[in-house]
């Protein structure tokens, strides 16, 4: 699992048909099969779920595991979590969000190996992401960002953030499993399943 640099070529989705794409409503024909879809709300729900898993997993790690890495050319646990936090600033900056003063993507992930500080950085970057996306309307998702490509828009940037979060969550789970650490949400599900078994007999 080698270090990945923020992609310069994005897979851009077809979000260029105008605000009507983001807020579908039923028409006079009485077609009620296409309910409205709130892109902002859905992206925030998805990102918040992933954020909770990152924090829960970081808190579940023994402090001395923060410097563990699967190979010399891979990120450590600490670097991976800080990379996640840093990419929130870097990705949302693509659509004009202001990252913290003096923020440097590459340097940021090497700033600390302290577990409490890492969790704090995950929380701060999540609040930044939430505030940025909360400040958008669904129509804003369709706004073009020419510097990213002729059809690229703000919605693409948000979904790059969503995809990136899931990618690194999977990476962090693999790190944990290699070290014999069961993700807390999985452990909780297993516990509930075990408690139900006696009731089923």
Residue ranges and their predicted role:
Residues 1-4:
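Positively charged n-region of N-terminal signal peptides that target proteins for export
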Residues 46, 50-57, 87, 118-132, ...:
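Alpha-helical packing segments of well-folded alpha/beta enzyme cores
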Residues 44-48, 55, 65-106, 146-201:
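Short, contiguous alpha-helical
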Residues 9-20:
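Bacterial N-terminal signal peptides
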Residues 110-146, 153-168:
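Acidic/histidine-rich alpha-helical segments that form the ligand environment
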Residues 29-39, 97-111:
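Acidic/histidine-rich, surface-exposed loop or edge segments in extracytoplasmic proteins
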Residues 60-67, 132-142, 178-183:
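Surface-exposed helix-capping loop/turn segments at secondary-structure junctions
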């Amino acid at each position: 699992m080698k270090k990945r640099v923020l992609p310069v070529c994005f897979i851009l989705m077809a979000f260029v048909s105008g605000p009507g794409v983001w807020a579908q409503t039923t028409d006079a024909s009485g077609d009620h099969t296409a309910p409205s879809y709130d892109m902002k709300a859905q992206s925030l729900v998805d990102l918040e779920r992933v954020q909770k898993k990152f924090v829960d997993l970081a808190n579940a790690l023994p402090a001395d595991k923060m410097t563990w890495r699967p190979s010399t050319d891979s990120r450590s646990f600490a670097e991976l979590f800080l990379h996640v936090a840093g990419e929130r600033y870097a990705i949302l900056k693509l659509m004009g969000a202001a990252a913290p003063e003096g923020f440097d993507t590459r340097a940021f992930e090497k700033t600390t190996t302290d577990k409490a500080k890492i969790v704090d950085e995950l929380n701060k970057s999540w609040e930044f992401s939430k505030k940025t996306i909360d400040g958008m309307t669904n129509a804003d998702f369709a706004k073009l960002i020419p510097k990213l490509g002729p059809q690229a828009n703000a919605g693409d940037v948000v979904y790059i953030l969503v995809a990136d979060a899931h990618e690194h969550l999977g990476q962090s789970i693999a790190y944990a499993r290699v070290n014999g650490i069961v993700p807390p949400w999985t452990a909780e599900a297993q516990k509930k399943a075990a408690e139900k078994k006696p009731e089923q007999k």
